């Protein structure tokens, strides 16, 4: 539950019962766990700026806390601070390459792409698609290959998205629909029609 006050056209965030309780626990116990939970609460309510400090405090108190590192990286990513997010994700992925079912290494590839580090992005997307079947990763990997002049290889990956989509259950098909449609568009643009 989040409360918002509108004053003079501006929205001001008001603390929720949960954030008040967590701040009270932090004041009493100063535990990394409570800082991390406060950061997660802010992250979930899309208050990314406010999430930074609790996550950083949690990491300072418990440098092994992967959840706090991941939350901090997600907050930086959401704020468009891709290089800072990548720096954290690089370390996290070294500790656990499969963290969050592959979403951490996928996020690292995204951060590289969004910060213009295309070579690193290409390499990291390659690692993602070797271990996980994220259509978005296949799509961006193919687009980067195309940018590098490797059109046939890119077409192959786009065909792979379309081909794999035929075996998906309905719930997964809906989740991946955007990337499947984008792959079709790419293929049509390159003169390839699929039945």
Mark where each language-model region is.
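Residue-level recognition of tetratricopeptide repeat
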Residues: 40, 74, 110, 143-144
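Start-of-helix register in tetratricopeptide repeats
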Residues: 33, 67, 100-103, 136, ...
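Short coil turns that delineate tetratricopeptide repeat
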Residues: 29, 63, 97-99, 132-133, ...
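TPR/TPR-like (Sel1-like) alpha-helical repeat modules
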Residues: 94, 129-135, 143-168
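Register position in tetratricopeptide repeats
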Residues: 44, 78-79, 114, 147, ...
């Amino acid at each position: 539950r989040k409360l918002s006050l509108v004053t003079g056209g501006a929205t001001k965030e008001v603390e929720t019962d949960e954030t008040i309780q967590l701040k009270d626990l932090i004041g009493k116990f100063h535990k990394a766990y409570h800082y991390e939970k406060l950061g997660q609460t802010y992250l979930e309510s899309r208050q990314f700026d406010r999430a930074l400090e609790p996550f950083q405090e949690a990491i300072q108190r418990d440098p092994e806390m992967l959840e706090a590192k991941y939350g901090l990286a997600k907050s930086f990513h959401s704020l468009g601070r891709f290089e800072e997010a990548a720096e954290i994700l690089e370390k996290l992925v070294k500790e656990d390459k499969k963290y969050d079912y592959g979403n951490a290494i996928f996020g690292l590839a995204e951060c590289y792409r969004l910060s213009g580090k295309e070579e690193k992005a290409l390499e990291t997307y390659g690692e993602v698609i070797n271990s996980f079947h994220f259509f978005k990763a296949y799509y961006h990997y193919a687009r980067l290959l195309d940018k590098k002049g490797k059109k046939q290889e890119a077409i192959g990956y786009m065909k792979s998205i379309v081909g794999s989509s035929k075996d998906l259950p309905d719930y997964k098909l809906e989740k991946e629909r955007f990337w499947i449609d984008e792959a079709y568009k790419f293929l049509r643009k390159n003169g390839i029609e699929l039945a």
